[in-house]
Amino acid sequence: MSETDMRLVVVGAAGRMGQTLIRIVHETPGVRLHAAIERSGSPFLGRDAGELAGVGQMGVAVSDKPLEAFVEAEGVLDFTAPSATVEFADLAAQARIVHVVGTTGCSADDEARIRAAARHARVIKSGNMSLGVNLLGVLTEKAARALPAQGWDIEILEMHHRHKVDAPSGTALLLGEAAARGRGIKLADHSVRVRDGHTGARVEGAIGFATLRGGSVIGEHSVVIAGEGEMVTLSHSATDRSIFARGAVSAAIWGRSQKPGFYSMLDVLGLD
């Protein structure tokens, strides 16, 4: 541990992603766990964060005081829920630190509050923090641009574990936005998220979504571009949720040297 290590806070520390983030921070050179935050009343308050995450004692007790933690830290890693994330965004702005947001399912109002916080914080937000998925987004945009809507239909399929609460996934929407950029259209005006009963023929230029939930699947995503007599499929499989945590820590380190603003993983990876 060095005095120059970036001091990071993990919020939602007792959750699956929270524990994974703690483990990755513990093993990554150049960063250290400054604080671990849980909601008030959590049975995990006071527990050592390292023991909770299975890496042994780290000397950091789980707390329910985020602002106290933020003002002494340099960054926060946030894979919580939209209602919590907008509150953490406000606190990160007050503390003027890096806020890495992997939370999905945010509403338009939530997004507006997070973007407003970026006037003072360095916000890095993505529906997926992995290198592979962000590269998939770039490839999807290029394919959508090369293959015209007249004759080529885009469908995005995703599957996650039974506990995921939002649909389509943030990654599916990230891929949908990439496809829409490639086509020069707005996703909101062309997405089809529900098909049931007599739907009629497919509308040219639509971007369809199909969602599956079950088991312990970490994340499966495919972009299908179907033409007459041929089909292009671009896909990504996540087999270990640590890929998201590693991406988040890399994003925090990158954000440390940036000016306040709103960034994505494409900025972090130099793919934008």
UniProtKB/Swiss-Prot annotation:
List the PANTHER family hit by this protein, alphabetically: 4-HYDROXY-TETRAHYDRODIPICOLINATE REDUCTASE 1, CHLOROPLASTIC-RELATED (PTHR20836:SF0), DIHYDRODIPICOLINATE REDUCTASE (PTHR20836)
Q: Which family does it belong to?
A: Belongs to the DapB family.
State a GO cellular component annotated for this protein.
Answer: cytosol
Q: Which Pfam families match?
A: DapB_C (PF05173), DapB_N (PF01113)
Q: Which GO terms describe its molecular function?
A: 4-hydroxy-tetrahydrodipicolinate reductase; NAD binding; NADP binding; oxidoreductase activity, acting on CH or CH2 groups, NAD or NADP as acceptor
Its annotated pathway reads: Amino-acid biosynthesis; L-lysine biosynthesis via DAP pathway; (S)-tetrahydrodipicolinate from L-aspartate: step 4/4
Q: Does the keyword Amino-acid biosynthesis apply?
A: yes
Which residues of this UniProt protein bind NADP(+)?
39
Provide one Gene Ontology biological process annotation: lysine biosynthetic process via diaminopimelate
Q: Protein name, please?
A: 4-hydroxy-tetrahydrodipicolinate reductase
Provide the gene name from the record.
Answer: dapB
Residues recorded as binding (S)-2,3,4,5-tetrahydrodipicolinate, renumbered to this chain, are 161, 170-171
